[in-house]
């Protein structure tokens, strides 16, 4: 059996077992999902979902985040860990989205990864969940499961992303990643 055949079997098995493939982060708009995803680094989605209601209530728009005092954001996101960097990045992201992208969260990897604190994992999540583009969100869970299934033989997130893009049907790639988590 080829890796591509194995990947298709995995897609079908996971689809049958987990028909609802959704992101566990709670967000009402693309920028909120971008913020929640940044907070999720080295933190559980459950913890992020406890923090974001107060954060989004205090800063309901991208402009509000852009004008926020980083120290105030730090206080709200403290329990997510790495709060100095995360707060700085969130305020920086808001400023960049406003000034460079006219208040619209970018829809491509290159522009997304140019934002403070946004790597390929976050960029792929936004491209897939917000814009419906084929995306592989190579987090630790997907990397571990893909290795166990024999789809990849690497722990490098970028290599996993590229290899899985070749194996997974584009229309299934984003959901496959959610189902693995």
Task: Report residues per predicted region.
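Catalytic cores of DNA base-excision repair glycosylases
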Residues: 2-181
